[in-house]
């Protein structure tokens, strides 16, 4: 058993440090947080609770191309529950090495958010391509002012 552990541990850790060419998040899910409790991810606070009916995101690290689709991004609770409320635009944010001293973020341009909570983007990140090595990448849907509303889930590397 000890031999298996000695052989497998380096393999497991190496798998997370390889530079992937593409990362896909198969779902976009809303932030689950209590009112007035900042659910902080990579130093970025969340807003009030949101939900989605679907979505996905893809980042090609080699080409610096990002695409995302979010569907049904709406508030959960409050007077605007079930709608995007006053939010009319969102952006995608890639976070590389979250929480580490060498954390890097890359943002997309703002895109319109429909009254049904739908938005889509395809293009390049503002400020250049993401770093070649991006450990534990996170994908967030954010307000222009900075708070995150949703995150990529069910991540897969290619």
PLM regions: where:
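Helix-rich interaction surfaces within compact, conserved domain-sized segments
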Residues: 100-158
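Structural beta-strand segments of beta-rich domains
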Residues: 64-68
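Extended low-complexity, serine/threonine- and proline-enriched intrinsically disordered segments
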Residues: 81-100
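Short amphipathic, basic-aromatic surface patches that mediate peripheral association
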Residues: 72-83
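Sec-dependent signal peptide recognition
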Residues: 2-10
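Sec/Tat signal peptide C-region and signal peptidase I cleavage site
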Residues: 13-20
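A mature extracytoplasmic/lumenal domain signature
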Residues: 72-74, 96-98, 125
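N-terminal segment immediately downstream of the Sec signal-peptide cleavage site
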Residues: 20-63, 155-158
């Amino acid at each position: 058993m000890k031999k298996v552990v000695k052989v497998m541990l380096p393999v497991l850790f190496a798998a997370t440090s390889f530079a992937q060419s593409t990362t896909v998040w198969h779902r976009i899910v809303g932030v689950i947080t209590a009112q007035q409790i900042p659910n902080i991810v990579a130093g970025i606070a969340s807003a009030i609770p949101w939900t989605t009916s679907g979505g996905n995101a893809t980042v090609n690290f080699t080409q610096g191309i990002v695409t995302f689709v979010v569907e049904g991004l709406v508030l959960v609770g409050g007077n605007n529950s079930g709608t995007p409320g006053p939010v009319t635009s969102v952006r995608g944010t890639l976070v590389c090495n979250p929480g580490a001293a060498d954390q890097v973020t890359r943002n997309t341009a703002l895109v319109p958010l429909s009254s049904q909570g739908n938005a889509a983007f395809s293009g390049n990140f503002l400020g250049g391509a993401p770093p070649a090595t991006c450990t534990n990448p996170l994908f967030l849907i954010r307000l222009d002012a900075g708070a995150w509303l949703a995150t990529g889930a069910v991540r897969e590397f290619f």
